[in-house]
C-alpha cells in the first residue's frame, strides 16, 4: 500500500501522534479538526458556532493540501459535547459544505481535546 502523509500550516498541527491526513490512491482520510486557530493554537471564541466554523475551515485547509476540497467528501463524522446543539451544527454544515451532501454520522461525546465543543473528521475521494 502506498500512503502519503498530508500536512499544511493552514490548519493546526496535530496535537498527538497522528497526521493531519493520509492519502492512499484517490482516498484521503482526514483526522478530526476542532475549532483551533492555526496561528494561536487556541480554541476560537467561547461560542459553539465559531468553533464549528473554524473546525470546518481547518478541515477544508487539510482537504486542499491533499488536492481536494470539502466537495470531495464522501463521509463526515461529527462529534458534539452537547447533542442539543445538533440543529445548530446542521445549519452551519449546510452553509459551508456544498451539495450533494456526503454520508454522515453524528456522535455525542463527554468531552473533546482542549475543551472543544465540536470536532469533525472526513473521508474524501478525489
Labelled PLM ranges:
Residues 2-126:
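Short, polar/acidic, helix-capping and beta-turn segments at strand->helix junctions
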Amino acid at each position: 500500500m502506498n500512503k502519503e502523509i498530508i500536512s499544511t500550516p493552514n490548519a493546526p498541527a496535530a496535537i498527538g501522534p497522528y497526521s493531519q491526513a493520509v492519502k492512499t490512491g484517490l482516498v484521503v482520510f482526514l483526522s478530526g479538526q476542532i475549532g483551533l486557530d492555526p496561528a494561536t493554537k487556541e480554541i476560537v471564541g467561547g461560542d459553539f458556532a465559531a468553533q464549528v466554523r473554524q473546525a470546518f475551515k481547518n478541515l477544508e485547509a487539510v482537504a486542499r493540501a491533499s488536492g481536494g476540497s470539502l466537495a470531495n467528501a464522501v463521509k463526515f463524522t461529527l462529534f458534539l459535547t452537547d447533542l442539543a446543539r445538533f440543529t445548530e451544527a446542521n445549519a452551519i454544515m449546510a452553509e459551508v459544505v456544498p451539495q450533494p451532501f456526503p454520508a454522515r454520522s453524528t456522535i455525542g461525546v463527554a468531552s473533546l481535546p482542549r475543551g472543544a465543543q465540536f470536532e469533525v473528521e472526513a473521508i474524501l475521494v478525489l
